[in-house]
Amino acid sequence: MKEKLAGKDYLFIGSMLFGLFFGAGNLIFPIHMGQEAGDAISQANFGFLVTAVGFPFLGIIALGISQSNGVFELATRVNRIYAYIFTILLYLVIGPFFALPRLATTSFEIGISPFLSNKLQTPLLALFSILFFGTAWFLSRKPTKLLDYIGKFLNPLFLVLLGLILIIAFSHPLGSVHQAEVGKLYQSSAFMNGFTQGYNTLDALAALAFGIIIITTIRQRGVKNSKIIAKETIKAGLISVGLMAIIYTCLSYLGAMSVGKFAISENGGIALAQISNYYLGTFGMIILALIVIIACLKTAVGLMSAFSETFVELFPKREYRFYLMIVSILPCIFANIGLTKIIELSVPVLMFLYPLAITLILLALLGPVFQHSKLVYQITTAFTLLAAIADGLNALPNPLKSLKPIAAILNFSKDSLPFFSLGMGWILLAVLGFIIGCLVHFLKRITNK
């Protein structure tokens, strides 16, 4: 039994974890945010890094110090039924319903679509989806090979290709960040808007989901002691989030500079294609196609493996390959509704789920303060759940928001919760729930004595 990982293992596992995290949204959202934030990009980028880098790292630390095998075990500290519901919902969101279809559509719209005529778009998206998820299924059949597939091969290739475009773009900028117009949403609350934009990467959710893969990989390298696994998980995570922070910052500033040459695009995928074509023409588009397909494929492999391993844990009557087949077929179908529509549909669900995930992560980190009392977990989560429902409803399309029951909830929330209009209404209730939970916990201890 090994006492710790070798130096090269940290590098490979950190590379694998980065590769698992860095997929579709990680490329397109910071660029689009940069275009809209303009000269306010420094504040917006800082907010983005908090949710897109800070919370995923806290999620890795939470899994490490709690010595949990994954999100289900962590969520049982609230309640076992809640753990089932939360885990299933989380994996459906980052699996077949939103994240996985988004990976295929992003790959297609950035890497393939620019080379096709309009009439070929729909049939070839269907064909591409089959090929994409067929390849991801093939690579996911043996979870023990993930370190080789992603950490040693796909991710280094991705970094080299992306680095090439970033070096060219920053050495010959499209425009000045300081001359870029600040969008309406970013004029008064750039940090907060950047913060909620970071939700779209799904990485705080993914940190909880990928925990099972990281821990399994470290065990495969010969480390068996739970406390040592916890430390090694955090060390490997530090390499991953460091890389993410650097690349996010480069992409967001690239987006802000690009408005010196291009109009703000419908989504970051279009902007990235325009930038690559401007600098390198057809060759640039080919490189970009490779970057995006590799980025999305490696994340798809990780998500499909994590989904299948977790569902075996939740429902052990079926084997790994059964769940792998399900998580290959469903997103292949959903991918055909298009990237912009997938993003639009996912926002209300993310606004509901993210506060619950962040709260769970923070409770796991603060657990020693209140002796990991179930009562504190339950009261804090209950308070957060109320606000998370309102945040999710607030992100619905306007026709649904105008329905009387929903409108009544939203009007009450706007009047009662600070930062609600910015998608942050859950913070006050989460803090209040935590304080009440701790008071009840410590009063019970004193009474019992």
From Swiss-Prot:
Signal peptide positions on this chain: none
Coiled-coil parts of chain: none
Localization per record: Cell membrane
Gene Ontology MF, one: L-valine transmembrane transporter activity
Bilayer topology annotation: Multi-pass membrane protein
Membrane spanning residue stretches: 11-31, 46-66, 81-101, 120-140, 157-177, 198-218, 237-257, 283-303, 323-343, 350-370, 375-395, 419-439
GO terms (BP aspect): isoleucine transport; L-leucine transport
Primary localisation category: membrane
Taxonomy, superkingdom: Bacteria
Cellular component GO terms held in the UniProt record: plasma membrane
Pfam families named in the record: Branch_AA_trans
InterPro entries recorded: Brnchd-chn_aa_trnsp_Livcs
Keyword Cell membrane attributed: yes
Keyword terms of this UniProt record: Amino-acid transport, Cell membrane, Membrane, Transmembrane, Transmembrane helix, Transport
Free-text function comment from the UniProt entry: Branched chain amino acid transport system which is involved in the uptake of leucine, valine and isoleucine.
Family classification: Belongs to the branched chain amino acid transporter family.
Classification via PANTHER family: BRANCHED-CHAIN AMINO ACID PERMEASE BRNQ, BRANCHED-CHAIN AMINO ACID TRANSPORT SYSTEM 2 CARRIER PROTEIN
Record's protein name: Branched-chain amino acid permease BrnQ
Protein source organism: Lactococcus lactis subsp. cremoris (strain MG1363)
